[in-house]
């Protein structure tokens, strides 16, 4: 890049521009322990420049997202059948990962048995498929890191960092002589709007099920973490819901669910006790890992919500469809073919997969165990749960496995490491400090799918995200402290 690196004075000016634009436009996060001063937000960790991504790779990721949406909708539908392969697989996984998958599975079974349960046929999947661009074979190819089915974040802030970099370019802040990028090659995501649109569509679907006695103005309940640091990302969706779609929303923790909500015994409808507002959609921005459930009361709150007639985004089965075990099984063409019969679609999905091994007593599982212990440098060990910081990398794998009983190994998958290109022409800004180190970038593609027990009713690509991290960091979670938000310049 001809204008890189910037001089010290140029960099200082750019840092000031980034900070001022971010504060003006809400590109923000709360720092740790912000509760003592809730007015003390900080600028989200970001790159100063956009990162080059091959247009071919970006287009492939966008085009395949509706296929992934359809796939995971079909998987969820199938998991509801007690005699299905994936129902039985998840049942077995619940035994090996009793702390998390087992808890979610037991809640699902308890929901079905509850006298209070009122079945809601609609499900809303708000998904994100994450990729690294692999360069191993000399060509650039998107390879899936994971498919997220619950609490996908940064749709709101992603579009802001895209607009930040576009502003810096168009306002000649990168170079006073003029823009250094073709603005048409800068991706501007509409993910904050598109996720809100999906939530609003779910509200309309809920209303369409009701008789005239239904509340005319049901709302969306955001179920959020206590002391949520990433609140401004979520606020983008809340504001869009109200301003673009006329839909109100409320933020509730699991504590609030226990204290403030009730279910009508006859209809199963979910209401806020004090205001009697009817909740049409329960949208989870928490509940994706064990630390989100701090006590048995939190699990009880999740069960309470699942029993209601509100549409869940996601419900328990949809969340469980995103387990790493199912990701591993889908790399088997025979398993994938049960859900996607179209040969071209199936081939396009398979191209995005790397080798993933179980660690069970199957032939493939025994090979996975051998590789984990004898060739760990090529692999990452992943548990079922989401969120940054849960994975075990390379040479740390053997000692980690030796530290747990072998009967628990099948709660993990062994995934081939992807080898992405390094970008040495960018600068990360975090806490007003700049870091000029090689970075790796992960492309996220959002997708929203509304479906029932038999059909996919709405299926859309819903925007993009780019997150970058230092080459020396294994994890990439921005809120977890490992990475930063970035934007895309296509080439």
UniProtKB/Swiss-Prot annotation:
Alphabetical GO biological process terms: glutathione biosynthetic process
An example molecular function term from Gene Ontology annotations: magnesium ion binding
Pathway: Sulfur metabolism; glutathione biosynthesis; glutathione from L-cysteine and L-glutamate: step 2/2
Reactions performed catalytically: gamma-L-glutamyl-L-cysteine + glycine + ATP = glutathione + ADP + phosphate + H(+)
Entry's cofactor comment: Binds 1 Mg(2+) ion per subunit.
EC number in record: 6.3.2.3
Cofactor: Mg(2+)
Additional facts recorded: Present with 3430 molecules/cell in log phase SD medium.
Quaternary state and interactors: Homodimer.
Protein name in UniProt: Glutathione synthetase GSH2
